[in-house]
Amino acid sequence: MKKLKASEIRQKYLDFFVEKGHMVEPSAPLVPIDDDTLLWINSGVATLKKYFDGRETPKKPRIVNSQKAIRTNDIENVGFTARHHTFFEMLGNFSIGDYFKQEAIEFAWEFLTSDKWMGMEPDKLYVTIHPEDMEAYNIWHKDIGLEESRIIRIEGNFWDIGEGPSGPNTEIFYDRGEAYGQDDPAEEMYPGGENERYLEVWNLVFSEFNHNKDHSYTPLPNKNIDTGMGLERMASVSQNVRTNYETDLFMPIMNEIEKVSGKQYLVNNEQDVAFKVIADHIRTIAFAISDGALPANEGRGYVLRRLLRRAVRFSQTLGINEPFMYKLVDIVADIMEPYYPNVKEKADFIKRVIKSEEERFHETLEDGLAILNELIKKAKATTNEINGKDAFKLYDTYGFPIELTEEIAVQAGLKVDMTTFESEMQQQRDRARQARQNSQSMQVQSEVLKNITSASTFVGYDTATAQTTLTHLIYNGEEVSQVEAGETVYFMLTETPFYAVSGGQVADTGIVYNDNFEIAVSEVTKAPNGQNLHKGVVQFGQVNVGATVSAEVNQNDRRDIQKNHSATHLLHAALKSVLGDHVNQAGSLVEADRLRFDFSHFGPMTNDEIDQVERLVNEEIWKGIDVNIQEMDIASAKEMGAMALFGEKYGDVVRVVNMAPFSIELCGGIHVRNTSEIGLFKIVSESGTGAGVRRIEALTGKAAFLYLEDIQEKFNTMKSQMKVKSDDQVVEKLTQLQDEEKALLKQLEQRDKEITSLKMGNIEDQVEEINGYKVLVTEVDVPNAKAIRSTMDDFKSKLQDTIIILASNVDDKVSMVATVPKSLTNNVKAGDLIKQMAPIVGGKGGGRPDMAQGGGTQPENISKSLSFIKDYIKNL
């Protein structure tokens, strides 16, 4: 067998199947496009669902790809096994109703055994089949010539995910020899068993049945092939290494971890787990961020945060106690660059995101682990179970993923009360991770729309009306010839001015009518074969196929949509100009009444940045730039500097919307003819939607004017209430009122101090001597959290050589502050005092050696915390 680099295996696989007439499907982004059923692209076939279920027809029925994928259903196993990964590449060849078992098996055998390709020894290959799949057996035995002893029948060789396409599969195994598979006596030492000697290298699925709702099986009208070969696994076989982690996909990362940690890989089993966790997770995190995902508290963002925090925790077992994961990004980029240049192109941005997350987690990790260790001690002394409410508080307050708590608990021989935890999560849905369901990689084939191949031409770029013919009616999932008034119907037209929802732009609405009927059009989408599919309600009359009709788009809405879409392009360019090239579109919505634009950026925009962006967009509007729209090949578009939206896939011919020199972008939407038609642009809000993603909402034209008119009306009302005449006097009056408020608050604060002092009496009498230190530990009655600081300042001025610790209860929230004379900070640190006290009142805190503060949510435990800290000082 040839010893090949992973990149060579990938390229050979693609080249082989191109020779066999396959079309290369580029690897899609890990964040699914137009597929809400998937959290991540999790297999090679996931991006091809549209072909298998009939929504789209591929240019060629033979497809090959190398698809990056993420699976996170067994994160806790990663690091502890030889082949578990959260990120992996799946090589696959697919047939959509073209070839079937004979060719699929012959292709696989040729690729694996031919000296031109992998050069595997035929006598080291075994296969498994379904017991009833005699066709596969005969191909392997009679046509390929595989001995019967190397064909194993296994009942589980049937691919079935429930309702939808299903069928038998055959798996191919490579015998690595007696040197492998002796580590565990429990290993099932045969092809198809759990062992390290006979490794599965390829799975061929023969999709030939439809699993119906009643659990019966019927033959599919189109039989399909879906295969999968894990690149990491095949690399381990080709390079003859024990695990995937010793391949050239991982070893450069391992070498860098060795340099940072000073530890060696493959010397200590426990440390090896940490090496594997870090190496796997950094690949996942780097690729996910490069494809548009960002750490967050829910959904796919939570997965990233969980992976990063898990890797950080394991890095501590290697003695790494500072942010370092971001330093591995360049290594990942170099390894994967030949096929995935995107990671290298976005490396700086990826590193900034990771470093920011690492720094945030390191801030809370120490406190969180300290609390968890206390919970473990408590559980070991009682029920051997960590209380679910405590686990939830750890998650909610300290950002500790529950999976991390569970993993640490298991290592300590404990379990977590997940029932109570889930109950707490349910009560705080806004903080919960987004619920997910395992998605199916294919759907039941819909033949109705797939079989409609007649052309439908979109003419809406040039007109909002058309005389046309109604060609197809779909009612209740079936194609019909007529539909009555009051019914909801789907239909197609030979020519249509209605834009189908796409690229963030909403669909047109309007009417389709003649003298006999009228349909109010509410939605327009794309059918599998590319036609615009209209949805509407029959207002009156009887609709018949073949009718000549007038199609009219709501022109007022269309004009507003055009303005907002062109303004979105100008906004995108302005954001890049003001904030930097790291800005990428993360989502958009273009409607008639507003536009919304999501983009990648750290932190809120300043008012000055918002003003700059707004001014830039309006300047381009007022310049009256002609909007030049052309169709051209993708290479020409890139050459002229057209910006492609990140994550989008484009065909050979693209549409370029040119507002040069300010904005040139690929887009299929509807736009104004000149930027002056937009009239006016006004940003109404800038907010965050998740870590690293900001959102701008804006108005154009008349809507922007009405918004400004409303603001002016409110300003005039405020001017009247302030009893001033000119606009300039408003600011002066406001400043005057603020100064008066500050003076009154200062008087009130002084009065509160005097009242507190009267209540406390002579504070010198309350000072205790503990372990040789003068200490004042007390609860104070103050009106607000801010007042405890001023009280501390007052006490500190009177007791300059005293350790002072104050706590207060304001509105059922605990505030605490500690101060230590600088002469004592070598022995006693204020930050340590607060860190010890805060968990007792259900909170956290910290600070400098001489001054620290904290808070909590359990005022009933204030006395307990004050007693505790006295004992703590006593034992220093």
From Swiss-Prot:
Any single Gene Ontology cellular-component annotation: cytosol
Catalytic activity: tRNA(Ala) + L-alanine + ATP = L-alanyl-tRNA(Ala) + AMP + diphosphate
Tagged with keyword Nucleus: no
GO biological process, one term: alanyl-tRNA aminoacylation
Alphabetically ordered keywords of this record: Aminoacyl-tRNA synthetase, ATP-binding, Cytoplasm, Ligase, Metal-binding, Nucleotide-binding, Protein biosynthesis, RNA-binding, tRNA-binding, Zinc
UniProt xrefs under InterPro entries: aa-tRNA-synth_II/BPL/LPL, Ala-tRNA-lgiase_IIc, Ala-tRNA-ligase_IIc_anticod-bd, Ala-tRNA-synth_IIc_core, Ala-tRNA-synth_IIc_N, Ala-tRNA_ligase, Ala_tRNA_ligase_euk/bac, DHHA1_dom
Cofactor note: Binds 1 zinc ion per subunit.
Binding site for Zn(2+): H565, H569, C667, H671
Chain coiled-coil ranges: none
Subcellular location: Cytoplasm
Co-factor requirement: Zn(2+)
A GO term, aspect molecular function: ATP binding
EC number: 6.1.1.7
Pfam family, one: tRNA-synt_2c
Domain commentary: Consists of three domains; the N-terminal catalytic domain, the editing domain and the C-terminal C-Ala domain. The editing domain removes incorrectly charged amino acids, while the C-Ala domain, along with tRNA(Ala), serves as a bridge to cooperatively bring together the editing and aminoacylation centers thus stimulating deacylation of misacylated tRNAs.
HAMAP family named among the record's database cross-references: Ala_tRNA_synth_B
Function: Catalyzes the attachment of alanine to tRNA(Ala) in a two-step reaction: alanine is first activated by ATP to form Ala-AMP and then transferred to the acceptor end of tRNA(Ala). Also edits incorrectly charged Ser-tRNA(Ala) and Gly-tRNA(Ala) via its editing domain.
The family this protein is said to belong to: Belongs to the class-II aminoacyl-tRNA synthetase family.
Protein name: Alanine--tRNA ligase
Organism annotation: Staphylococcus aureus (strain JH9)
